[in-house]
């Protein structure tokens, strides 16, 4: 307490158990500071993406780790989309194999699995899904969207049409099949001379609600690791906040059972519902190596998020789920896009 009687909030939060007594006596939420910090971040940033044009030394570096006989803390899935030939496959190969492919082979459906370790020692099994940007694969591409955690939407800096297609084609598609999933806008081939203004890229990033805009070159390895380090750091930070919330929720339920339950009964009501909450663990899903069908799902409706407990910290800067007009069946989106195409008879 301060001399004038007001409460001073400590910067050290402590564990939920160590705060039980003070919480019950004063009604102070042990994670109130975390909530306020998240709200302040959202208010200050809004829809403004993090723009990375040069190398950013402040992004944590995730080092390669071995998957052999090792249990990871998290499973993460990244799906890469964009126009055909814009550099999606080269970006993935440059990251996973540390080399630039000399021969271009159009991708149909590929996925790569690797493991990385964060600076705080936690490991992440990272599944990278490559997709085909050509129109003939419009019906196959949605098979890669189930369980995606972050989307990389790519465009080539030397091709203005690929940037326009981000707004006109790729964002509507991913927003239909996986609404609310965070998007990172990636400008590839930054080693090539280009007259494209960065302002246009920033404007598109804001319009689609991207959490970041990163310029990279797979040929020179410029910012290649930065793209994935940025995605990994964003994913891990949100997962740790979710774990923190679930710990607080579990602590409150234990107190409720000791006091006889929130409904004044024996506490069976709380025990029953505590089993229904999803926890952040490796059983959330598994990524199978060298297969394209391990996450295949029925596409009769747009994908929704897992049945996690609603997070009081907000949506971490994502756009709210927008009702899609293409929810009749799985191929309504493709048919609608083809109807809009103009046919010119010469």
From Swiss-Prot:
Residue spans of biased composition, Polar residues class: 16-25
Main localization (coarse): membrane
Endpoints of the signal sequence: none
Ion transport as UniProt keyword: no
Entry-linked Pfam families: Ras
Chain positions covered by the region annotation Disordered: 1-25, 259-294
An annotated GO cellular component: plasma membrane
Modified residues (Cysteine methyl ester): 343
Stretches with biased composition (Basic residues): 1-10
Lipidation (S-geranylgeranyl cysteine): 343
Assigned protein family: Belongs to the small GTPase superfamily. Rho family.
Name of the featured protein: GTP-binding RHO-like protein
């Amino acid at each position: 307490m301060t001399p004038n009687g007001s409460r001073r909030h400590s910067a050290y939060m402590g564990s939920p158990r160590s705060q039980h007594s003070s919480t019950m006596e004063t009604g102070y939420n042990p994670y109130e500071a975390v909530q306020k910090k998240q709200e302040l971040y959202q208010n200050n940033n809004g829809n403004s993406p993090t723009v990375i044009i040069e190398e950013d030394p402040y992004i944590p570096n995730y080092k390669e780790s071995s998957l052999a006989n090792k249990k990871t803390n998290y499973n993460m899935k990244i799906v890469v989309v964009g126009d055909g030939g814009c550099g999606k496959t080269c970006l993935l190969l440059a990251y996973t194999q540390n080399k630039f492919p000399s021969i271009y082979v159009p991708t149909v459906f590929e996925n790569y699995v690797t493991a990385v370790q964060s600076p705080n020692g936690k490991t992440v099994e990272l599944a990278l899904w490559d997709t085909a940007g050509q129109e003939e694969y419009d019906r196959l591409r949605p098979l890669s969207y189930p369980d995606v955690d972050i989307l990389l939407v790519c465009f080539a800096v030397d091709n203005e049409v690929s940037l326009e297609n981000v707004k006109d084609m790729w964002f509507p598609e991913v927003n239909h099949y996986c609404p609310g999933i965070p998007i990172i806008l990636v400008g590839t081939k930054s080693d090539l001379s280009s007259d494209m203004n960065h302002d246009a890229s920033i404007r598109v990033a804001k319009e689609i609600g991207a959490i970041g805009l990163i310029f990279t070159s797979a040929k020179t390895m410029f910012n290649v690791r930065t793209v994935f380090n940025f995605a990994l750091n964003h994913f891990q930070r949100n997962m740790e906040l979710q774990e923190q919330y679930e710990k607080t929720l579990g602590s409150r339920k234990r107190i409720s059972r000791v006091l006889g339950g929130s409904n004044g009964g024996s506490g069976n009501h709380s025990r029953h519902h505590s089993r229904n909450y999803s926890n952040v663990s490796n059983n959330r899903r598994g990524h199978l190596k060298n297969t394209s069908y391990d996450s295949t799902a029925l596409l009769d409706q747009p994908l929704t998020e897992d049945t996690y407990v609603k997070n009081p910290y907000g949506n971490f800067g994502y756009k709210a789920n927008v009702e899609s007009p293409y929810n009749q069946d799985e191929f309504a989106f493709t048919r609608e896009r083809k109807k809009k195409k103009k046919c010119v008879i010469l």
